[in-house]
Amino acid sequence: MKSSAIRRSRGFTVFETVIAIGVLAVLLTGFMVVFTPAAEGIRKSINVQQADRMASTLEQELVTLRSEPFTTGFNKAFTWIENKNKDKDALLVYQYRGSMTTLRNDKTPTPVPSVTGLLPGKDYVIVPMVRLRSDATNLKADLEAVEGGVYLVKCTQLVFNSSQLVAGTAGKIVDPISATMSTTPDDYPEAVIAFAAEFHLLPAKTSDYIAGTGFTAKFNTVKNPIFVRNLAVRR
């Protein structure tokens, strides 16, 4: 009888196993280096429609009179653009769930913190909003019903330089042509204030964070906005 030869398969040596583990570690490291920043960018990115909505919300709120002591929408816009580059009165843009039946004293929908058993469009609506950090009571209520992220907005007037509009000095409103300082809305000689609005996504959206020192530190050091829009307000 003819005997059949039994062929034994050879396993990996310890040396080969170590090499394979090393190659795998290099591949995983490369994957993390390439895709982790990309994932972070995707998380922070917003689409054009979202950017348009936030910019429009800011532009509209700047001239909307609520409970502030302003006589005109232009006066409000002048003051907010000039003074709101301080962390105490920082501008915040966000969306929250609002009631379709009840309003607060400032004519904004009452926040709806819990939506259990409720239907959007029937029991509540998503409200785009701009508030000052110093509007603590209303802001805290809004944040309990917030939808999506909260954005810090920094506004800087655009002025003429060599026939081009460029960013001026944050916290100051001047004649965009002569650079003469305007201390009040009545001093401002033009009918339009053009400004650049930087939108920065905040790392947290709780009222404790926004009222605390973490927000102040972020406000003073923030760079690289999610997006920037050139906007304008008119008398």
Give the residues covered by each predicted segment:
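Flexible, low-complexity segments enriched in proline/glycine/serine and punctuated by aromatic residues
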Residues: 12, 19-22, 26, 35-235
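N-terminal leader/signal peptides at the extreme start of proteins
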Residues: 1-12
